[in-house]
From Swiss-Prot:
HEAT repeats lie at residues 25-62, 86-125, 218-256, 538-576, 577-614, 633-658, 659-700, 704-742, 850-888, 906-943, 1045-1066, 1067-1105, 1112-1150, 1154-1191, 1196-1236, 1257-1280, 1281-1317, 1347-1367. Autophosphorylated. It is an enzyme of class 2 (transferase). GO terms for molecular function: ATP binding; protein serine kinase activity; protein serine/threonine kinase activity. This is MAP3K epsilon protein kinase 2. It comes from the Eukaryota. One of its GO terms (cellular component) is vacuole. It comes from Arabidopsis thaliana (Mouse-ear cress). The gene is MAP3KE2. PANTHER family: ARMADILLO REPEAT-CONTAINING PROTEIN 3. Pfam families: Pkinase. Keywords: ATP-binding, Cell cycle, Cell division, Cell membrane, Cytoplasm, Cytoskeleton, Kinase, Membrane, Nucleotide-binding, Nucleus, Phosphoprotein, Repeat, Serine/threonine-protein kinase, Transferase. GO terms for biological process: cell division; protein autophosphorylation; regulation of cell division. It is found in: Cytoplasm, Cytoskeleton, Microtubule organizing center; Nucleus, Nucleolus; Cell membrane.
Length: 1367
């Protein structure tokens, strides 16, 4: 019984109106489900589409049902037949012809047949076009062509389904907030609501072709909203590359952006792709297209493989040819290397024996220290040759002599050959420089090294023997060759008279008069002494050395600057330098003590600064491998000192740096660049300086840096605490720009992707925030005045280890004098003893941060005191010389005008040591760390001395004067690491500038103990405008120009990332990053604001970013920027804001509503009414507001938006869109406020005149909006009919387009039904005759072309008129 009841209920629920029985569900769409049905009267199978009536009004429902009744009259083999409709309380059921094989979209699924070949697609698309030709002739636009709406029978016949009704359902459902349905097939004009036409179906046909060929339509990899955006934005959808030329041309015609340029369906049927490929349907099905397609794929794969083999062979041949060419090419011959041309022709493999001979080429006028050291090292090397190497060395020597004899001048041949024997013996011990690797990597590197690392080629074995003469032999004639024996082309390279000269710069030829200056002067001095009756011989050689020192002191060396014991008499100092150099180098071994390694490293650093030529000796004889071994020692002091030594060696010498990279130094140094809790900041700084050299020295070193994963290291330097890590942040910014400027095949987008993946974007935004705060503070306090009329130059220089600012030739640094026991010296910088700094610094040698003599380079006080105590006297300045400047500091310390209270003046800490160690009571990190990074302490022409407060009270002084002087120093210096561009200062001027810096330093030291400003979490000092605490001083100390320069660089970097591909942009669209970026809109100056807005605009062009921008309240943050009315860059700012808002709000109703809620409509009105060039962005947004929401429409009405719409009817381009917006406002006019606005006489007259004067090409598009207007408002319908619209409608019935005729008949019917005097309308306009002519023309078939729906509509309207006439 229960089973029978269940069965009865089942059948009852499946029966529709006792006429159809519902079966299984066979499909599902946006507005309903499709079931198979059985006609209970005749047994026919039908398809029944079930549509919910929940969101459809009664009036719209009646219209849809009337449309279905009209479509029942259509009959064509390529369209699905409408059979009728049935309505229940909850659903509308549309009865359709059943097509048994289902849709093409279902057939091409991967689990079925998969994609179709072009031949089969041609068969199906030809039938689709046939169906469209019929529909368009009947005045019907399908509006939803896609694979799911193309059904097939088992005979292969194609039928178009779901035409006409689906779109009306969409229009009837005003609860939708965006374009719904199937966006991937939509034409741009459909998405933009600018008028649907028959050409919209042609666009959809193109999308369907790609769907059948690939299983998915264009942009299917995107979400629906981004896809809609791309359809509108892109010039054409992506077309697969593998298609034939004919089908590609066909698709390009379908995808014409302008709908008026697309061909109609009938024209496309005659396209070569369709015409050439059409064949009998059954024939095409008998021959499996899929099999043919697979065969074609296999054959094409074989061809590809053959082509690839040819490419490989071609590349291999090319490589062989390049190798042959390289092996035959001659290396450039420069200067002293001119006798090596034959050897240079050897292949790279020969360089294993001969490639290291570059050290034979140092000129005879090399400095004595280097020459004597060469002698000792060569002798020791010769003695240590192993027996196993003798045979090889002899062969090499004989071969070497054979090459060189023909090239060397005859009078030097014997000496040069003997010298080469000694040189090669030395190299065979293993101390040669790694030129072999350099050659294989870069021919330029070898040439540069031969120029940079030169040993005396003109000194033969005799000369080396004579250097070891007994002390009593003081004969000078054999020390130098006669001037006429010096080979031409030799250059004077050993001179270091200019402090900024580097080894590379020694390559340039010197004037002829400069050759052998040292020998000439020494000979002249000896001759003078002999003429005076004195002799050059002495038992102890003292007179000889005095003569040599006199010449050297004037010409080559500043002996007082050397780091040796000042108590040693001059006659004994010279040989001690060579001995000391050898001793220091020999101490650089892992088995030495920590103190010994550190001491030797720092002494070598000091020596290299005074004698840059010694670097070549060190590199030639030792290389970088011993230093790399020392870096493996897990001791901070050793690592710091060795890194400092490496930096000094490679400083400004690209060849040394490149060869250091070749032996693997980059990854090793990188390991010290990252942040670790137990790693001192000074080690990171040394590593950072080395990496900066890599970025700025040459493209080759930059490439090696990048290839060693250098970009993540640069990202790590963007520390959050900008005040504390300013140099590293600047390094990272400059380094990233160097990477981006690298001109290589690698795409810049790849670099962006690597950096973004490693978290650079959030760091850049935080840095932007910090720099903007720094710039703001500097602006509030007022930037420094420049006494000489020059403004501080914005720089992006290096973390120079020397901070050069003084020329050794012109002056020696001037410092505040202290008791001798309180200071030590190292190279040109001073250092406080532990006694002075113990109250503020830890003396722990494992924390080099605390021992910081020059602001950015580490020194170890306890070691340097021992290493450099011998040269204290060099830079001493008497107390009397500094009395005035020290007096000035007192008034500064008292803070008379700046509010710096003095507490414990006797214990004021040095400025830089103050920055390295925080007071115990301070809780906030980096409170005054800006001072530590004062521009000008970082990079100038000589090391700034350590600045620290004096115990003596100072008087006089003016803070503004000091800051002006300081800003001048800060603004100068190297530009991009070029030492030679730095200005020169006289001794007097430089002393004054140093005094100014010293006074600032002491004042900052005092202020730091009482400063009231604190740093934010990002390390930026926050202070009130006009504050007299430390913020004002810090703002001066950090040049506004410098901070602004880096602020712009960071903004430009963000812009680069915003322009990158979607993957990079996705990293930029995190919620926290965007929120932080938008917060800066009100904090930055217009130039930076414009760049941030450009970033936002670029992000908005990517559909995948729109949702993230919306979540970050981009619309809310952008709109206030439209309030800017005057000032710099206002137009550009408005342009970026409107463009971004346009991209965000286009298509999406929710975002349009959000924009309206945030007050965009008044701004849009202003741009439109003022006829601004930005009107192109404002108008679409303003018209979209009518479609957004009830609230947006209310705001439109309140701000006069309806009047703007009416005025746009005179604009040919915007008239159709404006009319559609008017129709939408009326359709949703609940309280009739919009209706009242349009019932005004002026509004009615504008609408009538617009209809009358509408251009022909727009006429078809305005009929549907007019139909909406008169069907939604009876009052406007009547008013328009009485004011001249009716005659215009009837007069246009002779239009030949079926779509136009059909809509005109609908309009006439709507007007007739609401007209107050229908009989008068019929008689005055002779309407029955007009309709009869339509029906008769249709019967003749001459003009109307079989327009079934037009005939049906005219006939039904004529019947209605006849009834009214009778009544």
């Amino acid at each position: 019984m229960a089973r029978q009841m269940t069965s009865s209920q089942f059948h009852k629920s499946k029966t529709l109106d006792n006429k159809y029985m519902l079966g299984d569900e066979i499909g599902k769409g946006a507005y309903g489900r499709v079931y198979i049905g059985l006609d209970l009267e005749n047994g026919d199978f039908v398809a029944i589409k079930q549509v919910s009536l929940e969101n459809i009004g009664q009036e719209d429902l009646n219209t849809i049902m009337q449309e279905i009744d009209l479509l029942k009259n259509l009959n064509h083999k390529n369209i699905v037949k409408y059979l009728g409709s049935l309505k229940t309380k909850t659903h509308l059921h549309i009865i359709l012809e059943y097509v048994e094989n289902g849709s093409l979209a279902n057939i091409i699924k991967p689990n079925k047949f998969g994609p179709f070949p072009e031949s089969l697609v041609t068969v199906y698309i030809a039938q689709v076009l046939e169906g469209l030709v019929y529909l368009h002739e009947q005045g019907v636009i399908h509006r939803d062509i896609k694979g799911a709406n193309i059904l097939t029978t088992k005979e292969g016949l194609v039928k178009l389904a779901d035409f006409g009704v689906a779109t009306k359902l969409n229009e009837a459902d005003f609860n939708t907030h965006s374009v719904v349905g199937t966006p991937y097939w939509m034409a741009p004009e459909v998405i933009e609501l600018s008028g649907v036409c028959a050409a919209s179906d042609i666009w959809s046909v193109g999308c369907t072709i790609i769907e059948l060929l690939t299983c998915v339509p264009p942009y299917y990899d995107l979400q629906p909203m981004p896809a809609l955006y791309r359809i509108v934005q892109d010039d054409t959808p992506p077309i697969p590359d593998s298609l034939s030329p004919d089908i590609t041309d066909f698709l390009r015609l379908c995808f014409k952006k302008d709908s008026r340029q697309r061909p109609d369906a009938k024209t496309l049927l005659s396209h070569p792709w369709i015409r050439n490929s059409r064949r009998a349907l059954r024939s095409s099905l008998r021959h499996s297209g899929t099999i043919r397609y697979m065969k074609e794929t296999d054959s094409s794969s074989e061809k590809d493989a053959e082509g690839s083999q040819e490419v490989v062979e071609s590349v291999s041949a090319e490589k062989v040819e390049v190798t042959k060419t390289n092996s035959k090419s001659k290396l450039p011959v420069i200067g002293g290397a001119s006798f090596r041309s034959e050897k240079d022709q050897s292949s790279p493999s020969d360089l294993g024996e001969e490639g290291t001979d570059s050290e034979d080429d140092i000129n005879s006028d090399q400095g004595p220290t280097l020459s004597m050291h060469d002698k000792s090292s060569r002798q020791s090397g010769t003695c240590s040759i192993s027996s196993d190497a003798k045979g090889t060395s002899q062969d090499v020597l004989e071969n070497h002599e054979k090459y060189d004899r023909d090239e060397i001048p005859g009078n030097l041949e014997t000496e040069a050959s003997e010298g080469r024997r000694n040189t090669l013996a030395t190299k065979l011990v293993g101390k040669e420089y790694s030129i072999q690797s350099s050659h294989s990597f870069s021919q330029k590197g070898e040439d540069g090294l031969r120029k940079a690392v030169k040993t005396p080629s003109s000194f033969g074995g005799n000369e080396l023997t004579r250097f070891s003469d007994p002390p009593g032999d003081a004969s000078l004639h054999d020390l130098f060759h006669p001037l006429d024996k010096v080979p031409e082309g030799k250059t004077n390279e050993a001179s270091t008279s200019t402090p900024t000269a580097n080894v590379n710069q020694g390559d340039s030829p010197v004037a002829d008069g400069g050759k052998n200056d040292l020998a000439t002067k020494l000979r002249a001095r000896i001759a003078q002494k002999q003429m005076e009756g004195e002799t050059g011989h002495s038992q102890d050689g003292g007179d000889l050395f005095r003569l040599m020192m006199g010449v050297l002191k004037d010409d080559v060396l500043n002996i007082d600057d050397l780091v040796f014991d000042e108590k040693v008499p001059p006659e004994n100092l010279f040989p001690l330098q060579a001995v000391e150099f050898s001793r220091l180098v020999s101490s650089l071994r892992p088995d030495e003590s920590e103190d010994a390694i550190v001491t030797s490293s720092l002494k070598l650093v000091a020596m290299f600064r005074q004698r840059p030529g010694q670097k070549a000796v060190f590199v030639t004889q030792n290389g970088f491998l011993p230093l790399m071994d020392l870096l493996d020692i897990p001791k901070s002091r050793v690592i710091c000192a060795v890194l400092q030594l490496i930096n000094e060696i490679v400083k400004d010498n690209t060849d040394f740096l490149e060869n250091a990279c070749l032996v693997g130094l980059i990854p090793l140094v990188m390991s010290f660049a990252g942040f670790e809790r137990d790693r001192s900041r000074e080690i990171r700084k040394e590593a950072a300086y080395f990496l900066q050299q890599l970025c700025q020295s040459s493209p080759l070193t930059l490439q090696m840096f990048i290839s060693c994963r250098g970009i993540p290291v640069l990202v790590g330097f963007l520390e959050a605490d900008y005040a504390k890590h300013r140099e590293m942040v600047h390094l990272a910014i400059d380094g990233m720009w160097q990477v981006f400027k690298l001109k290589k095949s690698t795409s810049r987008n790849d670099f962006c992707r690597i950096a973004a993946k490693n978290g650079i974007l959030l760091r850049l935004v935080n840095t932007l925030y910090s720099l903007s705060e720094a710039t703001r503070l500097a602006s509030i306090s007022g930037d420094a005045l420049i006494l000489d009329g020059q403004t501080p130059r914005a720089r992006s220089g290096q973390l120079d280890p020397n901070n050069p600012i003084f020329s050794q030739r012109e002056t020696s640094p001037s410092v505040i004098d202290h008791p001798d026991g309180l200071k030590t010296r190292n190279g040109g910088g001073e250092e406080p003893s532990h006694a002075l700094t113990s109250n503020s610094q830890s003396s722990d040698v494992h924390q080099p941060d605390a021992l910081h003599p020059d602001g950015d380079r580490p020194r170890l006080s306890s070691v340097v005191a021992d290493a450099t105590e011998d040269v204290i006297q060099q830079h001493r300045i008497s107390l009397s010389a500094n009395r005035t400047s020290t007096d000035k500091l007192q008034k500064l310390a008292e803070g008379a005008s700046n509010g710096f209270p003095v507490t414990q003046p006797d214990q004021v800490r040095p400025l830089l040591s103050l920055l390295e160690k925080e007071p115990p009571s301070r809780k906030i990190s980096g409170q005054l760390d800006y001072v530590k990074h004062i521009a000008g302490i970082e990079r100038h022409e000589s090391r700034l001395p350590l600045l620290y407060a004096s115990d003596e009270k100072k008087t006089n002084g003016d803070l503004e004067f000091i800051m002006a002087e300081f800003a001048e120093v800060s603004g100068r210096g190297k530009e991009n690491g070029n030492l030679d561009t730095a200005p020169r200062y006289s001794s007097k001027t430089m002393t004054k500038k140093v005094m100014a810096i010293e006074r600032v330093a002491s004042t900052c030291g005092i202020a730091s103990q009482t400063a009231s400003g604190v740093l934010s979490g990002s390390g930026v000092l926050n202070a009130r405008p006009g504050s007299t605490t430390s913020s004002g001083l810090l703002a001066h100390a950090l040049s506004a120009d410098v901070s602004m320069d880096y602020l712009e660089k960071v903004a430009d970097l963000l812009l680069e990332f915003a322009r990158a591909e979607t993957t990079v942009k996705s990293y930029m669209c995190s919620q926290s990053l965007l929120s932080r970026l938008f917060q800066m809109f009100n904090r930055v100056e217009p130039p930076i604001l414009l760049k941030i807005l450009e970033c936002t605009n670029h992000l908005s062009t990517d559909p995948n970013c729109l949702e993230n921008l919306q979540r970050a309240d981009a619309i809310k943050q952008l709109i206030p920027n439209l309030e800017l009315k005057e000032g710099p860059l206002v137009y550009q700012i408005h342009h970026e804001v409107l463009s971004a808002l346009f991209n965000l709000c286009k298509i999406n109703k929710r975002r349009q509503e959000q924009a309206a809620e945030n007050g965009i409509i008044p701004h849009l009105m202003l741009f439109v009414m003022s006829d601004s060039p930005l009107k192109q962005y404002a108008l679409p947004l303003l018209c979209d507001m009518a479609h957004a929401s009830r609230n947006s429409r209310e705001q439109l009405r309140a701000h006069g938006g309806l009047d703007v719409y009416l005025s746009l009817l005179d604009d040919e381009y915007w008239s159709v869109i404006a009319l559609d917006s008017i129709a939408v406002c009326l359709a949703q006019d609940v309280d009739q406020k919009v209706e009242q606005a349009f019932l005004k006489k002026d509004a009615i007259q504008k609408l009538v005149n617009f209809f009358q004067n509408c251009p022909e090409r727009h006429f078809v598009h305005i009929l549907e909006p007019f139909l909406k207007i008169i069907t939604k408002s009876s009052s406007i319908n009547k008013t328009l009919a009485l004011n001249g619209l009716t005659p215009l409608l009837i007069a246009r019935l002779d239009h030949q387009d079926a779509i136009a005729r059909l809509n005109l008949l609908k309009l006439i019917k709507a007007v007739y039904e609401k007209h107050p005097k229908p009989k008068q309308l019929i008689v005055e306009n002779d309407l029955p005759q007009k309709l009869q002519n339509l029906i008769e023309e249709r019967r003749d078939g001459q003009r109307s072309g079989g327009q079934v729906l037009v005939k049906q509509m005219a006939t039904s309207l004529l019947k209605a008129l006849h009834i009214n006439t009778i009544l």
